[in-house]
């Protein structure tokens, strides 16, 4: 790898210092480094376009938490640039490298001692009166939920053209396996191995107590409509972008064509991450 981009939040001094240290470290190894610092305090890269990454970028190093990496995943879109995250945030399910082992892991990567995991993403479309008004790829999840003062919402759910059910409650989470340890887990959904190919539907505070999360194969087409006209229903993608839904909108969710290419070194163990982050086996 000879061309590497480093992305970090400029609002965090420790991230800026680490970015410059990594840049100097890589330069000594004859690597050209491109630093992207224009990220707001929420980790959102809304001001950037895909062309901001040079065409010959071999790797993107993300300094921050999972939210920053989610923004980078959206920024990359369909480009096949591999990504590695250095955790400066909280849980860090996606950013598996720590500051302590950062340079050891980068040395492994430069030496070719790594594998690339393909993490499936979802494509989320909103159609209104035969027009496509919203389209995004998500790495973690898409969430349909009601506003703070709205009543229970009714979401008519159709899978591959066949009616599934009316979900009545506070909303629905549509999660990838990568996102299964995020909002999906907090809402009582299952943990799915991150490289699996599946779409998880998890109800949020379902009015019907027998409604439970369902795991679907990744090839299904999911269509959602509002069963009753109601205001203040929102679609949110990866917790960062979204739109207000109109009563006649149709939401279509499928597996995206281009997965995110996430670098994994031999020292990263998904089961160890689960044990540490979720404190399994600890008194």
Swiss-Prot record:
Reaction equations catalysed: NAD(+) + ATP = ADP + NADP(+) + H(+)
InterPro entries: ATP-NAD_kinase_N, ATP-NAD_kinase_PpnK-typ_C, NAD/diacylglycerol_kinase_sf, NADK
GO molecular function per UniProt: ATP binding; metal ion binding; NAD binding; NAD+ kinase activity
The enzyme's E.C. designation: 2.7.1.23
Keywords: ATP-binding, Cytoplasm, Kinase, NAD, NADP, Nucleotide-binding, Transferase
UniProt record, GO biological process: NAD metabolic process; NADP biosynthetic process
Subcellular location: Cytoplasm
A Pfam family reported for this protein in Swiss-Prot or TrEMBL: NAD_kinase_C
Binding site for NAD(+): 66-67, 140-141, 151, 168, 170, 240
Keyword Ribosomal protein: no
SUPFAM superfamilies registered for this protein in UniProt: NAD kinase/diacylglycerol kinase-like
Cofactor needs: a divalent metal cation
The keyword Kinase is annotated on this UniProt entry: yes
Catalytic center residues: 66 (proton acceptor)
Cited HAMAP family: NAD_kinase
Family statement: Belongs to the NAD kinase family.
Role noted for this protein: Involved in the regulation of the intracellular balance of NAD and NADP, and is a key enzyme in the biosynthesis of NADP. Catalyzes specifically the phosphorylation on 2'-hydroxyl of the adenosine moiety of NAD to yield NADP.
PANTHER family the record matches: NAD KINASE (PTHR20275:SF0)
Protein name, UniProt field: NAD kinase
Organism this protein belongs to: Syntrophobacter fumaroxidans (strain DSM 10017 / MPOB)
């Amino acid at each position: 790898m000879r061309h590497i981009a480093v992305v970090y939040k400029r609002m965090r001094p420790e991230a800026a210092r680490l970015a410059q240290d990594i840049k100097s470290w890589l330069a000594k190894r004859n690597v050209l480094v491109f630093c992207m610092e224009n990220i707001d305090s929420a980790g959102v890269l809304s001001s950037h376009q895909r062309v901001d990454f040079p065409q010959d970028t071999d790797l993107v190093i993300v300094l921050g938490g999972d939210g920053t990496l989610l923004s980078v995943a959206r920024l990359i879109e369909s480009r096949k640039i591999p990504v590695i995250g250095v955790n400066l945030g909280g849980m860090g399910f996606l950013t598996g490298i720590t500051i302590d082992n950062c340079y050891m892991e980068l040395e492994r990567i430069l030496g070719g001692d790594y594998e690339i995991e393909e993490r499936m993403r979802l494509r989320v479309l909103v159609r209104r009166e035969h027009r496509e008004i919203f389209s995004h790829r998500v790495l973690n999840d898409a969430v349909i939920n009601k506003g703070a003062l709205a009543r229970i919402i009714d979401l008519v759910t159709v899978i591959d053209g066949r009616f599934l059910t009316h979900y009545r409650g506070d909303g629905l989470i549509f999660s990838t396996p990568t996102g299964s340890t995020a909002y999906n887990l907090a809402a009582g959904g299952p943990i799915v191995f991150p490289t699996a190919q599946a779409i998880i539907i998890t109800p949020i505070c379902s009015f019907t107590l027998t409604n439970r999360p369902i795991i679907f194969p990744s090839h299904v087409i999911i269509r959602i409509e509002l069963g009753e006209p109601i205001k203040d229903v929102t679609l949110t993608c990866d917790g960062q972008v979204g739109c207000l839904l109109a009563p006649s909108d149709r939401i279509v969710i499928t597996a995206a064509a281009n997965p995110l290419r996430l670098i994994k070194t031999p020292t990263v163990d998904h089961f160890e991450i689960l044990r540490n982050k979720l404190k399994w086996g600890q008194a």
